[in-house]
Amino acid sequence: MNDYLLWVDTSTKIASFHEVEASDLLHFEQYENFMNYLASLTAQGYRFQ
């Protein structure tokens, strides 16, 4: 089973695929939920690193 992790900083609208201080860690167990969340962040103008 794979786990999908994402760090999100809502103040700067940046999502990271690696640990970033002052960001909230989100954990997804299902790939489809992870991808849907990434799509929603993209629609909200988030940048990814």
Give the location of each predicted region.
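Short intrinsically disordered terminal tails
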Residues: 1-2, 47-49
